[in-house]
Every structure is written in structure tokens, then in C-alpha cells.
Amino acid sequence: LLSRRQRQMCIRDSFETAESLSEFTYDGFCGANLSKYMIKASKEEGKTLVFLKPCDTYSFNQLIKEHRVDREKTYIVGIGCDGKLDIEKIREAGCKGITAVTEDGDTIKVATVYGDKELAREDVILERCKACKGGKHVAYDELAENCDEEKPAKEGRFELVEKLEAMAPEERFAFWQNELSRCIRCNACRNVCPACSCIKCVFDNDRYDTAQKANTTTFEEQMFHIIRAFHVAGRCTDCGECSRVCPQHIPLHLLNRKFIKDIDEFYGEYQAGADTDSRAPLTNFTQEDVEPSIVKERG
């Protein structure tokens, strides 16, 4: 856990002097994808240095592809990652009154006011890290010493999606209705998402009720997230930030991952952000593209 001083440091926009970098902290709880911050930073005077994990660089590449970030005004230092920790999972493992959390390889040591406890790292990492793309940075200017570029991608990326697909339509609808009913329209998922980079969001329109925070019907609960998922389809890199920041713990990444799975099956395997020049399946056409009738039959 971060000290009060460290928590204060987390909310600062940037480090502007070499001296201030002595307060820089990078540990198992630094899970934020900083690529979206470069939209604003790269428009300012001078060059900005940013530390990106392997998965973050996919989002950065996608922003480059969409002309949202000025690459010449950005200096990327690639940093290693063994999977970021989920404090909620640590608490659910029975750890209360936590005073410190330390990492020791594949073991997480948790000190509490009631005693110490050891947990397996794999059991308490963020859900997105269970589908890690591997240790390779697809964009960087310099790599830190702790990078393992040969770290392989994990398997089972679509296991949870397949479980949802196996449900009866009524059961699947009930699942999402229950999950989305907890939404408080805080917009955290939208604000953190690198693919949601519109200058003015369609939901921020005072002429319509979509700008209001509170949902008045179950349809509105579903509409916001379904439309957002459609808007980022083919551009979502599966960074998982939407689920990480959700205060209601809604597994929003599963909606986006379902789109990714379908796109892979319809148009061939595609990873958004893997490069900066290829065209996404939904903005490109080949004679091998799936026919609309097949999509309709598949459902």
C-alpha cells in the first residue's frame, strides 16, 4: 500500500525537475495505463517522458494511428511488469487491517495488524493481467533494465467470454442486467479509456437526457455501456482500464473482449495497437471478409 505521501504523489500531473524524480514510485499497485495522458501532454511545449508497461504501449500505438498523440513530442521508457496487484482480491483473501504489502517473486507478503500472510501472486493480480499479452513493448525509445521482452503471452484470454456465450439468452441478459444495474454513471470507464478520446462525447449533450448522471430506466443503464463498446470496437486494445477503475466492480472489459473475439473470428486475428499503420478490420475491406448473412445466422 502507498503511504500518505505516496498517495499525494499519485495525483500530481507530472514530474518537472530531476530532483522530483527521487520521489517517483513504481510498484505492484501502479496499474494505470498512462498512454491516454499523452493526448494532452504531447500538445504542450517541449517533450514529455512517459513510463509505459508492455500492455500500455498497444494503447499508445493506437493513439498514434488515430493521430491523437504527437510521437515526436513523446519519449517512452518501457518498464517491466509481472502483473499488477488487485487490492480488492487481497482483501477478499482474508487480509484485514493491512499495514504493508511486499512482493517476493511469485509470492505476495501481506502484513496486517493481526499478523502476516502470504498469497500467490497469480491469485491476486488484476483480472486483465490473467490475459497478459506478454512482455514485449511495441513502442519505446528506451527500455528499463527490468524488462523481460521474451515473457510469453498467457492463454485463456476468452475463457470468461465463452462462459457467457454458453449461457441461454435469458440467463446472459439477466447477468448483464444485474451487473449494469450497479452503474452510477460516474464516467470513470469512459474517462480512463484510451479509445474514448473524442473531444466532445456523444453522451455530453445537454439537448438530450444522455448527459445526466442518474439512469432513470434499465434501458439507460445498458445503453451507455453498449454504445461505448460499439464505439471502441476494433480499436480497443483490451487494456482493462475500464474494469480496473470502476467503483462498482462491473466487469466492463468482458463487453469489449466479446467484440474482440467476434472480430477475430469474422475477419481473422487482429490486435489493436500492435502497429501504427495497419487498418482495423471494421475500417478495411477484403474479399475474404465474412458475409453479413453469416453474422446474422451466428447471432
Mark where each language-model region is.
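Single conserved hydrophobic/aromatic residue that forms the stacking wall/gate
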Residues: 1-11
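Generic beta-sheet signal
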Residues: 46-50, 74
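Active-site-flanking structural segment that lines cofactor/substrate pockets
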Residues: 15-45
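Gly/Ser/Thr-rich loops at beta-strand to alpha-helix junctions
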Residues: 51-59
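Catalytic cores of enzyme domains
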Residues: 70-216
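Twin-arginine (Tat) signal peptide motif
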Residues: 6-7, 186-189, 239-242
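Short active-site loop/helix that positions an aromatic residue
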Residues: 59-66
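Ferredoxin-type iron-sulfur electron-transfer modules in oxidoreductases and energy-metabolism complexes
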Residues: 153-181, 195-299
